Amino acid sequence: MIVFYDYRWAGDHGIGRVTRMLDARLRLAHLNISGNPASPVDPLRLFLAMLKLPKNTAVFSPGYNVPLFVVRPYIFIIHDLNHIDRPENSNFLKKIYYNCILRRTCHKAFRALTVSEFSRQRIISWARVPEGRVINIGNGVDVNYRPDVDPYRPGYEYLFCVGNRKEHKNEARVLEAFANAVIDPAIRLIFTGNPNEKLMSLARNLDVEKRVEFMGRVPEGDLPGLYRGALALIFPSLYEGFGLPVVEAMACGTPVLTSNTTSLPEVAGDAALLVDPTSVEQIKGGIERLCSDPELRRMLSEKGLQRVKLFKWENVADKVKTVLQKMELENKND
């Protein structure tokens, strides 16, 4: 059986990195299809592309795009149910897509894959499918994230916050906690991405505008150095299907503060400082501890470097291969 891979998801974002890492290890033929896989018209486009394939073929998508109708064996990755569980990240078309097309495909596809046990259980509950139809393949960390990379040296100490200005990234609470934390005022807070008026206005009102920086779009190759140079990663997200920044920071030897909700405690284990992401006071306390206690930072760094050994792309690819082999075997028997 020939399995075609939907490579259109490749990019610098989370799903894009998963796409590239699996492509390098699985070496599947790329599906002959163009267009944005997240487009509202893509279910039809993907359905038509699959109709053109020979019968003894299958399709694997590393993202959450699915065909209007499943006409060939199909496997895909649902990284999370963000658009269902976080209404501010959804709209009418996304709700229709998830509830009418994606949910049905969870029943019709050979298997749905996901990246954490949290997401797996959430998908099983939402789609109302048997447990065996959703497989947790985990996630990996690229070898470029390591403790011996050259750290970013801006001339001052900083806390690092990887985000995109979406509400579930919880950056307003991070900013408020940072402003209220009793720490060395020379320490700055650095965000990836561009500022928005809401955060800039909040920074001005909290009188920390000069202590907060936005890096704009950060090339992926620069991220390891930014992690490595930071006192800590501050990542108290309200919702994650996995949380790649947590393991990327750990791989660089950087201490992590993250949330005690969704997938994050599962990913971080005991190798991070866990806080209630809805509590500014807990985030503030975590920031104060990380900035004032070098022994805590050292301990979290060591634990993180051990923890991250669990997250290898080779392991993820092996789990995908197992599913592909099972699909081929069942297709032969049919």
PLM regions: where:
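Carbohydrate transferase catalytic cores enriched for Leloir-type hexosyltransferases
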Residues: M1-D334
